[in-house]
């Protein structure tokens, strides 16, 4: 029975993945800050679901929690980093930006490094992260969020290079959603908003295929290509 740990599983994509995987032959460990919601998810099947309360901005406590959770489950084969945050911040208030940086950059890096080292010692494993198509270009209304997702995309490419050169069976998957119908989707006039259940289904499929990069939904790949091709002079006027 494969063992999966999902970071940030109290709501949205993380919770959806935990619920879907619990219907199959997996042991699932979940983390989050809100214990009542973790208990709610685990109530679905207490024999297959385990939880550990964890705030990923506390880097030392996070590693301790992950080690405890891994011991409870008897190992880990797949690590999925879903935890993330971001705010619209056209006023450039640092108080709004700091939680994004602590979660999406510091917390993410701490967990990704721990997971990769764990898989190196185990000589196998699969590291998955939920980044965003927002990491493709900068954003005047959410500068820290887009920059943090660009960091995650670049960091995962570095780990993918490291995994490719490794003698071990280590895989990495960078999931890049567009707009998904969760609390993270902010702003007016959002388009191509993907329902959570559809996003979860596509993410699960990408993980099973060990895809290096997957766009959710698939059409966002073409939007990303267009954004990359746009000259800065045009993009900055959008």
Model region roles, listed by residue range:
Residues 82-88:
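Conserved NAD(P)H cofactor-binding loop of Rossmann-fold oxidoreductase domains
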Residues 132:
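Residue(s) in the substrate-gating loop at a strand-loop-helix junction
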């Amino acid at each position: 029975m494969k063992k999966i740990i999902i970071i940030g599983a109290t709501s949205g994509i993380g919770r959806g993945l935990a619920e879907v995987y619990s219907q199959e032959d997996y042991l699932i460990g979940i983390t989050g800050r809100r214990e009542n919601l973790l208990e709610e998810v685990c109530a679905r099947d207490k024999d297959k679901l385990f939880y550990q309360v964890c705030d990923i901005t506390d880097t030392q406590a996070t590693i301790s929690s992950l080690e405890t959770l891994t011991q409870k489950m008897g190992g880990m084969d797949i690590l999925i980093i879903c935890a993330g945050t971001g705010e619209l911040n056209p006023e450039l208030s640092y108080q709004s930006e700091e939680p994004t940086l602590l979660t999406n950059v510091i917390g993410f890096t701490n967990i990704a490094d721990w997971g990769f080292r764990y898989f190196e010692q185990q000589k196998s494993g699969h590291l998955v992260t939920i980044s965003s198509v927002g990491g493709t270009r900068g954003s005047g209304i959410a500068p820290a969020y887009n920059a943090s997702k660009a960091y995650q995309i670049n960091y995962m490419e570095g780990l993918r290079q490291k995994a490719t050169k490794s003698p071990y069976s280590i895989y990495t998957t960078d999931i890049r959603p567009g707009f998904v119908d969760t609390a993270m989707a902010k702003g007016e006039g959002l388009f191509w908003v993907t329902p959570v259940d559809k996003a979860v289904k596509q993410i699960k499929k990408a993980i099973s295929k060990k895809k290096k990069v997957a766009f959710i939904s698939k059409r966002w790949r073409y939007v990303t290509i267009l954004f990359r091709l746009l000259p800065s002079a045009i993009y900055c006027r959008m």
